[in-house]
């Protein structure tokens, strides 16, 4: 089972067709990998604050 997205309305679903507009849903592409972590300092600060 893969996460899918409706190209027409943008709703995420697990079904082959969107439940709102009956458009065929497509497989979502994963975000592009980058070794530069833009949000790493914020994530580490939040983790440190929780400890």
From Swiss-Prot:
What GO annotations for molecular function exist for this entry?
A: snoRNA binding
Name the chain's protein. Ribosome biogenesis protein Nop10
Keyword set for this entry? Ribonucleoprotein, Ribosome biogenesis, rRNA processing
Q: Which gene encodes it?
A: nop10
User: What Pfam families does the annotation carry?
Assistant: Nop10p
GO cellular component, alphabetical, reads: ribonucleoprotein complex
Q: What GO biological process, any one, is recorded here?
A: rRNA processing
Q: Which InterPro entries match?
A: H/ACA_rnp_Nop10, H/ACA_rnp_Nop10_sf, Nop10_arc-typ
Relate the protein's function as given in its record.
Involved in ribosome biogenesis; more specifically in 18S rRNA pseudouridylation and in cleavage of pre-rRNA.
The entry assigns this protein to a family as follows: Belongs to the NOP10 family.
């Amino acid at each position: 089972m893969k996460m899918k997205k409706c190209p027409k309305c943008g709703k995420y679903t697990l079904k082959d067709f969107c439940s709102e507009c009956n458009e065929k849903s497509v497989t979502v592409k994963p975000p592009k990998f980058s070794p530069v972590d833009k949000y790493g300092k914020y994530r580490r600060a939040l983790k440190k604050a929780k400890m």
